[in-house]
């Protein structure tokens, strides 16, 4: 994904 670090 990409939001893994966004909403980490």
UniProtKB/Swiss-Prot annotation:
Gene Ontology, cellular component aspect: late endosome membrane; lysosomal membrane
Organism per entry: Mus musculus (Mouse)
Function of the protein: May play a role in clustering and fusion of late endosomes and lysosomes.
Oligomer and partners: Homooligomer.
Keyword line: Cytoplasm, Endosome, Lysosome, Membrane, Protein transport, Transport
Gene Ontology terms: biological process: protein transport
UniProt membrane topology term: Peripheral membrane protein
Cellular compartments annotated: Cytoplasm; Lysosome membrane; Late endosome membrane
Keyword Membrane listed: yes
Name of protein: Vam6-like protein
Signal sequence segment: none
């Amino acid at each position: 994904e990409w939001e893994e670090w966004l909403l980490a």
